[in-house]
From Swiss-Prot:
It comes from Mus musculus (Mouse). Residues 15-300 form the Protein kinase domain. It comes from the Eukaryota. Disruption phenotype: Mice present extensive liver damage from apoptosis and die as embryos. They show a marked reduction in TNF-alpha and IL1-alpha-induced NF-kappa-B activity. Detected in heart (at protein level). Expressed in liver, kidney and spleen. Serine kinase that plays an essential role in the NF-kappa-B signaling pathway which is activated by multiple stimuli such as inflammatory cytokines, bacterial or viral products, DNA damages or other cellular stresses. Acts as a part of the canonical IKK complex in the conventional pathway of NF-kappa-B activation. Phosphorylates inhibitors of NF-kappa-B on 2 critical serine residues. These modifications allow polyubiquitination of the inhibitors and subsequent degradation by the proteasome. It is found in: Cytoplasm; Nucleus; Membrane raft. This is Inhibitor of nuclear factor kappa-B kinase subunit beta. Component of the I-kappa-B-kinase (IKK) core complex consisting of CHUK, IKBKB and IKBKG; probably four alpha/CHUK-beta/IKBKB dimers are associated with four gamma/IKBKG subunits. The IKK core complex seems to associate with regulatory or adapter proteins to form a IKK-signalosome holo-complex. The IKK complex associates with TERF2IP/RAP1, leading to promote IKK-mediated phosphorylation of RELA/p65. Part of a complex composed of NCOA2, NCOA3, CHUK/IKKA, IKBKB, IKBKG and CREBBP. Part of a 70-90 kDa complex at least consisting of CHUK/IKKA, IKBKB, NFKBIA, RELA, ELP1 and MAP3K14. The active site is at residue 145. Belongs to the protein kinase superfamily. Ser/Thr protein kinase family. I-kappa-B kinase subfamily.
Amino acid sequence: MSWSPSLPTQTCGAWEMKERLGTGGFGNVIRWHNQATGEQIAIKQCRQELSPKNRNRWCLEIQIMRRLNHPNVVAARDVPEGMQNLAPNDLPLLAMEYCQGGDLRRYLNQFENCCGLREGAVLTLLSDIASALRYLHENRIIHRDLKPENIVLQQGEKRLIHKIIDLGYAKELDQGSLCTSFVGTLQYLAPELLEQQKYTVTVDYWSFGTLAFECITGFRPFLPNWQPVQWHSKVRQKSEVDIVVSEDLNGAVKFSSSLPFPNNLNSVLAERLEKWLQLMLMWHPRQRGTDPQYGPNGCFRALDDILNLKLVHVLNMVTGTVHTYPVTEDESLQSLKTRIQENTGILETDQELLQKAGLVLLPDKPATQCISDSKTNEGLTLDMDLVFLLDNSKINYETQITPRPPPESVSCILQEPKRNLSFFQLRKVWGQVWHSIQTLKEDCNRLQQGQRAAMMSLLRNNSCLSKMKNAMASTAQQLKAKLDFFKTSIQIDLEKYKEQTEFGITSDKLLLAWREMEQAVEQCGRENDVKHLVERMMALQTDIVDLQRSPMGRKQGGTLDDLEEQARELYRKLREKPRDQRTEGDSQEMVRLLLQAIQSFEKKVRVIYTQLSKTVVCKQKALELLPKVEEVVSLMNEDERTVVRLQEKRQKELWNLLKIACSKVRGPVSGSPDSMNVSRLSHPGQLMSQPSSACDSLPESDKKSEELVAEAHALCSRLESALQDTVKEQDRSFTTLDWSWLQMEDEERCSLEQACD
């Protein structure tokens, strides 16, 4: 459907006529706009010169459109009141929803699609058109004229939606009409329609297969520039599995059963769709669409299997090759790694699978964890969801990447750039050259993404290392504080012990134990280990900062972008040449751009792999440091527990020493009540019970002396009683503790047992 200039203004109430959208088999399609509500509709009106038979078929199309209801078939609308009166004849108007995206032909003609649509766009198109055809066939409707001009695009909530239009193909397929009205669209018609034979729904299979092939490759499958008669006689010679009949640059006709390159499909989709196209493009209608698994008309179910594939794309950073793996919902990551090992030779244990942000695929999640729906991006994104494969057994990544082999026609002009080609040959081969430069740029960008994913992974490991470094520093400080406290405490204890040995308690075993503690804590601390690790981590940090600051670590653009833009401009100028200027020409300028692009690609790849090797080396250092830091932290924690244990032991020994001292207090010492013979008294007040007559007979001075002695005895008695109560209370407290670990002298043990008795 081609866009036309605006028509003379015409209104019908709030409705205003806008531009002509296109011309169909029966008449014109015009856009109308409601100025009050903003609603837009497409009005299809018939030409006056229709034959009676086609007038009846026009009315039949309107009836069909009004009863259909499917998201991929354009919907009928009510004709606004009064608009029927504007019709040029008595035939009814057909009102339809307006799809602002234009038709598929307009989309295919965009320069970017010269070698086929993007993968996501191909999948959405196949899904939508297959769904629409299924619906029509279930309602016993055969479209018979499926082509890009009869598919329109509507922007949905998440993606573009494709809708089939123009169900009014009802021309009589006599020889005259075929050579006039259908010139340019014959290649979408099934052979049996051209041969005026009986047909079934399989005519739509041929049209759908031809349409799908063009969307994948950018050109029609069978001699697109040949006239109908010669076309028919040559194409019918193809085998049942041939899906391409083309001319090379020398004019030789070639038949092939393979999907041609270039296209934008991954290897798995290309292989599966190649087999599906072989079903759809069979020359004989009885065999067409028959699937080996699903039988006759099983092509739609076979396509469902393809569209429902879940694919994981793995970019091997060692070779630069993308491997695509179909996976099931419950397939484990380990299973995927086994398949990767079979394809790449990289051992499962050495495989590191990174996502774009540098995240490692989780082993406890299924292989589908890295898949997003490629059909929701409308094919606009240039990059598939890639998983980047690194080989952990490698430190130095050598540049092994070479550009993809060019298509056959591009190889020819590389060998003979001065060779003159026809305009149609130039248009095709120049489009392929431009696509080849685009591919070089995209391959370079993917390798750059892989290097950046490795860099992000390094930064994540470095972040973990930094946290562990901080934990190590904190643990080291805590340990140092406890060591300093312990060393200071035991030094003071040793000094005080030495001071009291002349008149106090002595114990060689206790002194030896303290000396051993002092030596034991000297082995704690790990200061040298911590210092060495910090130095290595600081050196690694410097290397990482240098990597981030390096221009090589940033996105590589520049020359390849410029060359791709120059090639696009050359191709655009060729496409837009007026018809009278479409003459032969050579490809020297295009070849020059392609050769420069190849050189630029190889240079950028060397830069990327130099950066990747440095990144891998830094990551290896970080991975080596992580367990060493963990080990040192673990040893420091053990040292801390040792210091705490020694501190507890020393404190228990001090308390035991105090117990021994207290036990000695209960023995005869200078100034004790026993030295004053207080213990021989039956009662502390015995001295006070002497007869008063004896006291009276003493002189006055003797009486005073006797009173002082009695008072002293009383005080001593009370002191002895208080001391005994205190010792008993201490005994009850001490005996609740376990002192079995402390070895005591026999004499001291006996003394303690007597005191307890």
